[in-house]
């Protein structure tokens, strides 16, 4: 899997959402290898779009389409200031349910201190989380060459996610979560309360 993360400050979040709807209607049918996307904006206008493709080549073919170029030229005017792009083929997916059914998405960004250990912890915690956090539908994590990462956690609802955060975690799970926090140094959270989810 290949992931492209696009981030920036929105002048008009609703206009960005409309542009995504236009892409879904008019451009998605011709996007061969497209697997879906997640997007949205925080209450302060920080926006993120995360597109998933089968491969970097599929993403590049989509990017090379003239209609894609025109669409992006129209879309970027709704951002304020520079837009950041981050690409990765180092992607880890954890799914306990249908991610596209999420009503709340929390984005975590930061630096990973030990990539291999992070992968092991995620695999080990998967069955535990599926039991102790039924509100968590799953997560998608993209690791980048500069040791940065972007993780998207998909929840049934914000209310359920907050309740899950307050719930006491069993000993083994608590130990793993503490180690995860040491390995995955989160520096930024984005709470997407109205996620834009596009199915392929």
Feature locations, PLM:
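Short S/T/G/P-rich N-terminal loop/turn motif that feeds into the first structured element of a domain
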Residues: 1-50, 54-200
């Amino acid at each position: 899997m290949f992931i492209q993360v696009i981030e920036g400050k929105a002048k008009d979040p609703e206009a960005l959402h409309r542009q995504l709807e236009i892409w879904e209607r008019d451009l998605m049918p011709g996007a061969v290898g497209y697997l879906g996307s997640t997007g949205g904006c925080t209450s302060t206008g920080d926006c993120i779009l995360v597109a998933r493709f089968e491969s970097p080549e599929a993403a590049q073919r989509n990017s090379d389409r003239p209609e894609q170029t025109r669409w992006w030229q129209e879309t970027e005017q709704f951002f304020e200031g520079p837009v950041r792009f981050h690409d990765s083929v180092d992607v880890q997916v954890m799914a306990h349910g249908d991610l596209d059914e999420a009503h709340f998405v929390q984005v975590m960004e930061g630096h990973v201190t030990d990539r291999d250990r992070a992968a092991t912890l995620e695999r080990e915690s998967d069955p535990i989380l599926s039991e102790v956090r039924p509100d968590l539908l799953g997560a998608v994590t993209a690791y980048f060459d500069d040791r940065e990462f972007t993780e998207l956690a998909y929840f049934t609802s914000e209310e359920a996610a907050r309740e899950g955060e307050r719930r006491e975690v069993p000993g083994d799970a608590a130990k793993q979560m503490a180690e995860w926090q040491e390995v995955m140094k989160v520096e930024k959270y984005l709470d997407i309360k109205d996620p834009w989810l596009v199915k392929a």
